[in-house]
Every structure is written in structure tokens, then in C-alpha cells.
Amino acid sequence: MKIFQRKMRYWLLPPFLAIVYFCTIVQGQVAPPTRLRYNVISHDSIQISWKAPRGKFGGYKLLVTPTSGGKTNQLNLQNTATKAIIQGLMPDQNYTVQIIAYNKDKESKPAQGQFRIKDLEKRKDPKPRVKVVDRGNGSRPSSPEEVKFVCQTPAIADIVILVDGSWSIGRFNFRLVRHFLENLVTAFDVGSEKTRIGLAQYSGDPRIEWHLNAFSTKDEVIEAVRNLPYKGGNTLTGLALNYIFENSFKPEAGSRTGVSKIGILITDGKSQDDIIPPSRNLRESGVELFAIGVKNADVNELQEIASEPDSTHVYNVAEFDLMHTVVESLTRTLCSRVEEQDREIKASAHAITGPPTELITSEVTARSFMVNWTHAPGNVEKYRVVYYPTRGGKPDEVVVDGTVSSTVLKNLMSLTEYQIAVFAIYAHTASEGLRGTETTLALPMASDLLLYDVTENSMRVKWDAVPGASGYLILYAPLTEGLAGDEKEMKIGETHTDIELSGLLPNTEYTVTVYAMFGEEASDPVTGQETTLALSPPRNLRISNVGSNSARLTWDPTSRQINGYRIVYNNADGTEINEVEVDPITTFPLKGLTPLTEYTIAIFSIYDEGQSEPLTGVFTTEEVPAQQYLEIDEVTTDSFRVTWHPLSADEGLHKLMWIPVYGGKTEEVVLKEEQDSHVIEGLEPGTEYEVSLLAVLDDGSESEVVTAVGTTLDSFWTEPATTIVPTTSVTSVFQTGIRNLVVGDETTSSLRVKWDISDSDVQQFRVTYMTAQGDPEEEVIGTVMVPGSQNNLLLKPLLPDTEYKVTVTPIYTDGEGVSVSAPGKTLPSSGPQNLRVSEEWYNRLRITWDPPSSPVKGYRIVYKPVSVPGPTLETFVGADINTILITNLLSGMDYNVKIFASQASGFSDALTGMVKTLFLGVTNLQAKHVEMTSLCAHWQVHRHATAYRVVIESLQDRQKQESTVGGGTTRHCFYGLQPDSEYKISVYTKLQEIEGPSVSIMEKTQSLPTRPPTFPPTIPPAKEVCKAAKADLVFMVDGSWSIGDENFNKIISFLYSTVGALNKIGTDGTQVAMVQFTDDPRTEFKLNAYKTKETLLDAIKHISYKGGNTKTGKAIKYVRDTLFTAESGTRRGIPKVIVVITDGRSQDDVNKISREMQLDGYSIFAIGVADADYSELVSIGSKPSARHVFFVDDFDAFKKIEDELITFVCETASATCPVVHKDGIDLAGFKMMEMFGLVEKDFSSVEGVSMEPGTFNVFPCYQLHKDALVSQPTRYLHPEGLPSDYTISFLFRILPDTPQEPFALWEILNKNSDPLVGVILDNGGKTLTYFNYDQSGDFQTVTFEGPEIRKIFYGSFHKLHIVVSETLVKVVIDCKQVGEKAMNASANITSDGVEVLGKMVRSRGPGGNSAPFQLQMFDIVCSTSWANTDKCCELPGLRDDESCPDLPHSCSCSETNEVALGPAGPPGGPGLRGPKGQQGEPGPKGPDGPRGEIGLPGPQGPPGPQGPSGLSIQGMPGMPGEKGEKGDTGLPGPQGIPGGVGSPGRDGSPGQRGLPGKDGSSGPPGPPGPIGIPGTPGVPGITGSMGPQGALGPPGVPGAKGERGERGDLQSQAMVRSVARQVCEQLIQSHMARYTAILNQIPSHSSSIRTVQGPPGEPGRPGSPGAPGEQGPPGTPGFPGNAGVPGTPGERGLTGIKGEKGNPGVGTQGPRGPPGPAGPSGESRPGSPGPPGSPGPRGPPGHLGVPGPQGPSGQPGYCDPSSCSAYGVRAPHPDQPEFTPVQDELEAMELWGPGV
């Protein structure tokens, strides 16, 4: 027998050997040990002890040899050892033991002996004595044979032992736990009618190893203890305590009434979940709890768990090999407590107990409800009411007196379902709970929100008060794009319900949201929207004092403080633009204007926020007026004086001209502006002269000419003559009383006559008026006499738009004076003016006009399209409106618009104009690629188009084809047309719901060739094998340069024949798509492009050759991402087939994408031609290659493979079950997880589903929360139904909150929601049912039950196979068949319904309720043999690493202790293809090639980018004039007034922002621990608050830079792998250093290698955050960064606690809250110990070591430390023992395997 084996230069412990601990120190000379004794520990273990020799010696040699022969195994021990345990012995084998003391090179005589375990057992007393023998130091482990105390009380008990089986214990220490349990069980009288003992083991998820009623004898229990398997996982003690509370102390599990109930917990670490509520539940239900902690257990936590007093119920030992020291004390205490409880139970046996009944909830509010119950029987001391949110949270409780039967639960969360349990508390026991649920109401919200008193920068908000609210939160933000983030909030007290929001932006729409606050909780919001007022422009513009070169502007000010005004005015032709800014005044003169010019005015108010919209107006300056007074006096025979009055200071000069009336020379003189008279001399006597006067202004313009006639005196005349002529010539008289006669103030029915009185002797004036047309003799219309002192008269009523001649005659006492006449004209009936158009869009526009000067009653607007027939439309608006938005117009259409003013006398003349909507249509529409049966329409896109409707119509038979394409499309092709036919192609542009007019062209298809008549090709008939084909088939054709035109046509012919073999094309059959690939793939047509074989084949014939390089990998990815999509027509549940044709090696990688697609269920056929790489084809094609890979020598050899390819493709497409890739092989079946969207890339879109860690923490699973009701239409999943034989496979687990009622794990419903087939789980009855309909239409079910079925309901992951055949149904659980039952052959299903997961059986209809559970795998395999081949590799307890594939990101830990390098390995194979190299330097220019042939014309290039916008500014539109003759090209139009900056428009109103929520109180976070199998989640924990960053640990020595690794995974996985790698490396190195120290007899001080905490499991995808809870304890420190190679030994760090990240909580997203309080400082992680040094005081740390050489790059791995348990320690060989060290109180060495 071999105990040690030398390898290289180190002594290493063999796998079956443990470490010997040392106990005593004896000094003296070398002498032999004495008193060699043996003590049996178990059936394969023995303890050897001896007395140390006297004198000085260095150590011992322990030799163990099988007597029957075999290798002697030797172990060197230190001189302090006096005992050792040998394990792994054969009970029937005789062994010789020798113990030799030595000192340097001298040895003592051996102390030796022989033993056989069976012989030693026979000598033992079969009944151990009750008396306990004190062993002094107590370090000796007790064995069942050594137990001296046996509980002999007649009292019995139900004892449930809960054992921690987490990774931190390790397999080695778990053996010591078994020894402890064996000793514990031995102390009691165990039997079915005596004390019963059950046991559960827990880690991530608890499991029952055996129930209380599982065994009937003590021997059976002890045998079960010895065979107890080690579980492994995380430490979730709270979950485990709750598990035994719900499962172990139940009658069905063997628990008895009237019997003491004892719970014993054994754990080695701090729990990663909350232990207080489950411990309290157990204690209050009558279970007395004992807690035994080992090593890193938390004493405070043990005290929280155990019953009182702590001194007798809490035990804690430092190491596992010291557990035997507490056996006696524990068993004594248990025995005495059983006796005491038995007496108490018997004393109260006559008392009546029971739970309360009739749980009723009432008075439900948002924060409370009342709970009522009927009293429990007997003498109830108190009632305990426990309540907690169903979706997770910390339980609360209320304790009331036993006389009370109701209580109000307060401070609840609103709109939350609560679980309620009421327990009756008796003197010595507690009843079962009376349970129920209730949901609180939603918090009352504010109502009647009113936004009012809106100004430019403020508004008031008002709402009705909410009873009970503690305050209100108001959020408000602008909706304008670009300002949405400028959100503000306001918190106010509960007494305020009317507030003002100030500081707002003008002319901006705001959304205002009000929340009622109840403490930190908020109600639902009430929201309103309102727009602030625009900045007020000035009002009521008035233009006065308009002259020829000036005018005055007057306006009313705005209602608020402004900074000033900006005035802009310009003339009509845009040559004169002026701008001036003025102070806050209300009038301003304009000067320096041009006479007779139209000016446009715009006045802006200027505020701090900007400027307002303009107040506009238009006016025209007057012409330079004629002189209204011209007088001739001082007349002589040769001269007279001309006198006038200047009209303005701007008159520059006067030009005076005169000429004899009867002919003669005109003379003139230019006079200065200050002159107002001039004497004309040198005239002829008695001659009549015409005198003219005009003013010449500074700008060169001239006034109208004023004329007067004067006659010089004859030589005999002496009295002067005077003539006054206003604008017309008047005969000179010598007496007149009138001058400056003016007719003005025109209206439509009146004129005012004014004159100056020049003679005070006038008694009266006679005013006569008549129309100016007609005969001069016509009759006077009217005569009015006025006094001589009156100088004006209003003439009315007159006719509108009529010219009148008014004559005023002065009347003297002696007769009439000279009459003076003047014309006047009434105004026409006034109508609107200045029609303007704005806001033009594709279906609307706005018209604006200026009101007429005369009063109106309203306006009538009439409009009609110009070029298309249609009704005339009209509308009416009030007198105060001068603008209207006309809607529902046609796009790009001219409309005639007429506006009539409604006046008292009727309608005015119409203001007419032509307006036009914007054109919603394409441009540059052309027909291209015109063939005999096809053509393509090309156009230039419209910038606002969202879609195009393209229509082609035959002008012969009026047949139409129509398609709708996207707004970015520039072409569309039509096929199946008639040759030599005229077609009209129309494109309609669509903008959302608006459709523009068609843009059309005519095109004629090509004629049939007239040379040899040809006939349309015969459509190939479908082949028999393809009659049932139904698939989505994509052909990928290599279009690279190496193929060429001729060979490409051969490929097209091959495709034509292959597709022709198909039967039905379209959604009811096979859909075909085509991609041509080179550098960039190009879609020739999509899967849903063609519905008939004829059109499909025609499209194939017209595929053109592309040319380029070969990028096959890129093309395959393109096909997956672009063509296998819903938009392209991909159907769910239909086989996906790809056929790749290529003639060369790809210039990119094809392996990865091909593998991914094969794993996703795609069937890929690869066809290689000529120079194609066969190995690459094998990588591309699916397996087996014999069916999926083809190769031909040239392009003429396609016929050789055509039939075989068609057969294989059609067989793949005809299968009811598509091909899926599972566990490395291709199978026919359905990947149901993918079909339900339960995969990593899709699950976030499935409502009610979250991703959680699954088995091994490396597989994802998906938690279906309550009422998630995940479903999919059957036609997507199983369009052809189910096969006759199939296997349904699930990997799932039941959760604590999974209801007790039956639910369908999976079922198919028809369109009436009737179940057709499915699997039912009854969590309450612990049964499994499968049902379907048989072929005769009868409903049939089979139900399975029993112990093997029940275990799937206990919270662990289990694998379930249901094998359905034509005669029976088999159930296989965890790869073990547990039952089968006969069943008739099933009928096929209909595909008109849905398939659902988790639907409650009692829930009817398409909706309803569903149960929560976790699902990791769900497949349907179309075979009955799959269950026999499955190895359950996903289950930790059944996984065989040798036959199972590697776990994702896994690594293996070496089982040898060798540290020396092995021999060089054989040369490696060829490496992977390297990455693409950098671009090389350009090579030298090659010789010129021959001139190529002229190529075909290239396609038309895309339209160029739109040019920049012009800088001109639109002017005010003028009045429409009469249509004139076509003129020459005019000059650029005038500029308009620059408008104010408009506020940006907005898109749609965004949804309201959710309320920032309160800071959620944190639940207790679990500390990081080793990765393990996740357990059944309990009530989800609540996120803890973040603590401050812990102090950094000391840095390690940096390692050498490694090679570039492969792309990493998510950050959390990378961190886990990095930390795990450190754990393994550090522990191996320290392990080896410790071995070296021991075997070379180097004394060493105690140097514990402490447990390194394992990394946390990979975080799941975030679920919806749970409801906020209370503040939890501080979180544990996170992992430090990656370490380098080990540095010098560090100080021993504090022992960390183990744990892992908890699963995400379940629930809807809570509102945002403020930051939580800071947590306590974290701890640094202990450093890795270095190798031990020689004895002596601790020296200073050494310098950093030189970094080692760069190691080779490895594949990315994931090292689970738990799998590296105890390096170098394997299970014992049947023929070899293993040693278990015994630790004394002296020198101790701790050795822990990685991950322990």
C-alpha cells in the first residue's frame, strides 16, 4: 500500500491522504514510542495513538503496510504528534503499523502492531455506557462507538436537522459533518414510534434528504447519514429555515401532534439572506431551535436563530474537527428539553387548540385595511398577525390580545397586494396560520386641475385638495423641442392648492403635473398643458400726417414694461429699407420719404426675453401737391404780378412760365424757394396770357402745374384785373369773394366743399353740384345756399363712385360775383384689400386681407380649384376677423379665392387672387430597364414623403398593379407585364394620412422579337419530393469577378431549374429570396416579393451580374439580419434554409457566423465550384456534410448535383419538425424558448418576465412572474401541428410563491380558448398530468404521482421529459424514468389558437391568471428516444464532467500536486487565420494595359444635395392685377420686412415624466460568496443602499503583459473569471509551499491560509425593481482589482463573510428617490500568503519580485473555485487508506482547498 510517492524533488501527499495534526511535545533521548493503541472511528477509519518516548528526538516515521502484501506507505511526523487517524481502510484487511522515533540520522526501535477493523469492532461494547469520560483537552473526535451518553428518556421527539452544504465547507470537512451527525443520531432511541429524525441540506436551494417518516430504525438513519451527498452552493440560511418550516414539520412529512419538535441548524458562515422572520416563524410554531456554528459562523446570527437561552441553544466551534467536542453537551441538552417539552405537552393535552377562522378584510384604503377573524378555540393568549407584500418585502407583524378579533394594518404601500396570516398563540404552542390576501387602493390623486391667469412668463395652477395628503409635488417643463430637459419641480405643503408658476418662457407650451404626496409616497399624477402668451406687440397702429415726404406713426403701448421698439419700414421695390430703435414712446415721425411711394411698416416691442411679433401697416406718400393759390394782380399794360403760397419747406425752386393764349413764345424763369411772388414784365398791352407755376423739389421731382390766365390792360384801362384759378383756368374777373375752393373728405355717399372767403362783403354763397358726365347743359342735381360767413358744406347723399362738379358763387347785395368750380368724386363701395397667403402646406393654407375703410358686417370667402372640376366652396367669418386657415385642399393645386365684404348696401366688389398649396409629389419620374414583361419606375425622393403608392395601369385592358413602398425608396419594378403594351405609371406621394396627386408617365414595354418566333418558357413542373415543401429559402449567389458573365448565367440557369422543382410559392408554400454577394451583398428580391412560381422564375432570369470580391461571411450575416426578418416575410415555425453557391475561398471569416446560424436552427447547404475551398464549405454547411455540402468541378456540372440538392432541400422543407441544434447535434424539433421570446436578446420585450441565474450560475433562466401569461399564436409555433411521437422537455423549478392550485406548465388552446394538449402541475396535490385529444375526438388525461413526482415541487431545478407515443406516455425526471401509462394515439392540433405558459387551470378565456415559476429550458423533440440519450448535464447533482460538454466559461482544476514543468508537447497544428494586416505601401506602377472596350452606360447618379437657401426676404404680397401679356423677365422682387424670430415648433407631446420617487429603504444585501447553484428564491430582497468605497488593499506585483485575449464577456463575468483565477493560483502556490515545508521538516509557525471568498454569481438582467423597503444593514465590500503574481507574505486579514448577489426583485419600477445615506466603510480583502519562511521574528517585506516571463495566451475560461476542492485530495482507492489529521491545542496547520 502506497501512502507517499516521490515526484521530482518534492514530497507530495497522494490524493487519498489527509494531513496529520500534531498534539504533544516530548523531549528526551531517542527511544521507541510505547503504548500503541487503536480506536475505531468508523467502518473504514481508525485512530492510532501512542506515548511519546523519553529524551530528545526530532520526529516520527509512521509506516502502514497491508499484511497480505503491498507497498508500505510512510509519513514523517513532527515530534509533537501522539495520535493520527487513518482513513480509507478495508474492514476485512489486516494491517501492520509501525511508529519510529528518530533524531537526525538515528532511529529508535519501532513500536508496532497489527489490526483489522472488524476484529476491533467485535471487541467493542455493543451498548455504550451513558457515562461520559472526560478526555482532558477534549480534542479527540468521538465516534459512534465512543459516545458515552445515550438519551434514555421515554419521551419522544421529531428532530429535523438542517445542514449547510455550501461550497465553503468543502468535501473534506463535510466528512467530519457526517461523523458529527452519526454521533448525534447514535445518542437517541430512533424509530417510527420513537424519536424521528429528518434531515435537509441547503445551499442556494434547500432540499429534503429524508423526511421524519422516511426510516423506521436507527441503523437506517445512520446509513443515510454516512451516504449523505455533498451538495455545494451558496449560503441562504433564511430560505432553508423557511423551507423546513413549510415542508418538514407537516403531518405528511411525518411530524406528529403532541410530540416535541426540535430543529438543529449546522452552518459554517453568515447567511446571505434574512434569517429573522423564518426563525421567528419556526419558534412561534412550537419548534425549539438549536444552532451550531463552525469556523466563520456569525455568533450574533446564531443567537437570532436559536431559541432562548443562548447558553444552551447556541454552540460555536473554531474548526470542523472540533465538532465532536459539543456532541455530549448538545445531546444532553436535547434529551432534557425533550423531557421538559413532553411534560408541558401532556399537561396541556386537555387544552383545545386550533387556528382562527373566517378571515375577512374591510375598510380598505391606500395605506391601511382592517383584518377580522373568528376566535380560535381554547384559551388563546394572543393573536399574531403577519403581513407582507406579495411581490416581496420584509414581513411585519401585529400582536394583539387573545380577546381581540380584529386589527387595522397601517402604514401600508398603496396599490399593493399583501399576504396575511393570523396565528393563535397558546401557552405552549401556536396554531397554524389563517391566511388570506388583500390589495390596498391607489393613493387618491389631485383632481380638477386648472391652468389659468396665463401671461407671457407665468401661469397659475389650481386643483382640488386631496384628503390626507402631506403635501404636493408640482413638475413643469416646456414641451418645445430642445427645451424638454428644462424640467423644474416645486414642493408645497398640504394647505396650498393654488400656486403661481413664474419665470416661464413666452409663447411656449408647458406640461404641468401635480402629485399628491403621502409622506414619501406619491399618488398617480394629474397633468395639464397650457401655452404661455406670446410677447405682446404694440397695438392699434395709426398712420397720420402723410405727406409727400413724411408721415407720423402712432400706436398704443403694450400692457407690460418693455425696453423699447424697433421700427422697420421699406418701399415696395425693396430699394429702401430703414430701421430704427426707439425708447418706449408711442409716436414717431418718418421723414425723408419718397413722394407717391408705398411703404410697409413693422413695429416690434423689445423685451428682455426678445422681441414680439410685428405690428404692421401700409401707407402711400402723397404726390407733391400743386400750388393751391395762384393770384395775378398789379396788372398794367405791359406787366402784372404773380403771387402764390409755398406749400412746404422742401420745395427747392419754383419754375414760372407764361405764354400768350393765342400763340407766341413760352418764357420761363426759375425762382428761389423763399420767393412767393414775381412781376412779369415786357408784356404786350391788352393780351391774354396763360401763366403756369410748378415746384421743383430737392430730389428732382416736380409738383403738378398750376395755371392762371391774366390779361394786360389796354392802353386806355387803369383798374387792375385779378384771376384766381385753383387747378383749372378761370376767366379773369375783377370782383370775387372766393379763393382756394377744395372738394374733399370723400366717402361713398358724401363730399365736403371748403373755400376761403376773400371778400367780407359777400352776403351768401350758392353751392350747386351736378354729375360731371354728360351734356354741359345737364340739369343741376342740387343747390344749397349758405350764409356769407360760412366757408364749408357737406354734400349728401351722393352716389358712390361718381364724379361731381361743384360750383360756389358769391352773392353780393348788388348781384353775383365770380363763380368758382372744382371737381370731386365719391368713393366706390369699399371692399377688402391686400390679399396675402401664408402657412402653405400640402393640404392647407392661410389667407389674410386688410379690412376696407368702410364699415362691414362680415366677409364671404369663396374658393374653387382651377384645373380640376369641383364644387365652389365658401365660408363666412365675422367683421373682426381678417384671416382664415383653409383646410382639406388638394396638394399642388391652384385655387381662385374671392373675398367679399358684407355691407349695409350689399356685398362689395370681390378681392380676388390665386393661391396654391405645396406640391406633394415626386420629381424626375422615369421608366428604366424596360423589358418585354417588366419595367422599373425611378424617381427623385420627396423630402417629406413617408411612403409612395406606385400604380401601373395597362391602357389596353385597364389591369392594374399597385404597391406601397417606403419614403426613402427611389425605384420600384413591375413584372408580369404584357409585351408591346402601353402602360401608365403613376406615383402618389404620401405624408402620413395625406396623399398627393399622382405624377404619371407613359411607357411601352418592348415588343416580342420578330426574328425566329420564340415561345414563353415552359414552367418546370414540381417534383414529387417537393409537393409538401414549406420553408423560407434564401439563395446566396457569389457574384465575384472570378465567375464572369457567362458562368453567372449558368448559375442563374441552375437556380431556375432548382426553384422550378418547387410546388407552391408564397405564404402557403415556400418563399424564396435571392442575394448576390461580393464586397457588399445585394438583395435581388425578398422572401415576400413573389406569390407565384411564374413571377419568381421571371425575376430570377433578370438578375444581373454584379462583380467584386468574395466576402461570404459578411453575406451570411447580411442574410440573417436583413432577410430573415418579419419585414422581409420570414414566418415563425417554418424551416429556414440557405443555399450558398461560391467558386472561391472567402476573404473574411465564415466559421463563426455559420456556426451561430446552425445553432439557431438554420439549415445551410453549401455548393462549391472549381476553386472553392472544401474545408470552408464544410464549415458553412450544416451537419451531416454528406447531405449539406456539394462540390462540382466547373459551372457546367451543376446537373450532376441538381436532383440530389432538390431532394435534400425539399425534405428539409417538408418536415413537420424543423431541424434544431441541441447539445452538439442536429435534431428535428422546436426550440420553444426561442419561439416564446425567452432568450437573452428578446426576453426584455416579453412582459412579466425577468432573467435570473440558472443552474451552475452560468446558464440563464427566465422567471415568469405572476399573471405574466406568456403566449404565442399556434400558427407561429406549430403551423403544421405536432407529430404523432414526440418528447416534451422542461428544465424548471417551482418557486415559494407558486400557487397551490393547478396550472399548465404549457398548453395549446384553440380559438375558443379550449385546451387541446398540455402539461398540468398541481402544486397542492403534488401531481403531474398530461392531456390531449385522441384520434376519435375524445379528451384523455394521464396523471402521475408519488415520491419521485413530488420532488419537482420542492424548489430545486428539475429536468422533466414527457415522452408521448401512439400507445403510451412516459415521465422521466432528472434522467430517471418514474412512470408510464397507456394512452391512445393523439389527434393533431388546430393552429388557430394560442400556446401559453403558466396558465392557471381555473382561469378561462384568452386572458386570465398565470402562475409564477422559473424556466431554464423548454424543447419539443420529434422523437421518443431523446429522453434516453439526455445526460442531464445542466443539473449539478447529475452532471458527469467526462461525458458532458464544458460549462460556459469553465475551467478545470488540476488533480495533481506536481509543480515541475512536464516535457515539451508535440508541435501544434496550424494556427487560426490571423487578423487582417495593415495596408501595404503602394507598389510600382505596372505597364499600361490594352484599351478596354466601351462599356455600357452607367446608371443615373443620385440627385445632388439641395443648394443653400437664398438670402432674400419675402416681401408683403401685392394686390393681384389683371392678367396681362407675357412680359420680359423682370428684376428680382422686393425684399420684405424681416420678421421676428419665431419660436421653434414641436413634435408630438412627449409622455409625462414619472414622479421622482422616494428613497427606497434597503433590504439586507448578501455578502459576496462563491458561485453556486441558485436556490429557490424566497421573498425577493430589497436593494440595499450603497456604502462608501472601501479602502484599497495593497497592490500585488504586476505580471508580465500577456498576449491579446479573445473578446471578453460582460464585465461581471470578466470580473468573476479574474477573481476566480487569482483564487486558484494563490491557493495552489500556498498549498505547494506548505507541503514543501512539512515534508522537509522545516519548523513553521502557524500560518493559516484562510478562505478566499468566491466571486459573486453573474448578475442577471435587471428585473423590474421591487417596492421600496426599509434601510438594510451595510453592504459588504466589493472585489478588488486583478492581482499580479503573489507578493511577499502579508498580515493575516480579517475573515470575510461569504455570500452572493441576490436575485433581482420583482415588481414595477418604483419612482426615483433622493440618494440614500452613506454606508459604513468597507474592508479590504486579505492578501495572498507567500511561502513560509524559517522560524524567527517577522522581517520587513521583501522587494517586489522580477515579473515572470510572458505566458502563452489561453482561451477565456471560467474557474469555479468550488470545483477545485482540496487540491491533491481524491477519493480513496479501495485498497489504500487516507489520513485525517487530528488537531491538538498546540501547533496547528490549516489547509483548505480552493473555494472552501
Curated annotation (Swiss-Prot):
Quote the PTM field.
Lysines at the third position of the tripeptide repeating unit (G-X-Y) are hydroxylated in all cases and bind carbohydrates.
Q: Which organism is it from?
A: Homo sapiens (Human)
- Compositionally biased intervals (Gly residues): 1536-1545
A molecular function (GO) term: RNA binding
Taxonomic classification: Eukaryota, Metazoa, Chordata, Craniata, Vertebrata
In terms of Gene3D superfamilies, this protein maps to:
2.60.120.200, Immunoglobulins (2.60.40.10), von Willebrand factor, type A domain (3.40.50.410)
Where does the record place the region Disordered? 124-145, 1462-1613, 1644-1781
Q: Which gene encodes it?
A: COL14A1
Which residue stretches belong to region Triple-helical region 2 (COL1)?
A: 1654-1779
For this entry, the protein name equals Collagen alpha-1(XIV) chain
Question: Which ranges carry the Laminin G-like domain?
Answer: 1229-1424
Q: Which residues form the VWFA domain?
A: 158-330, 1032-1205
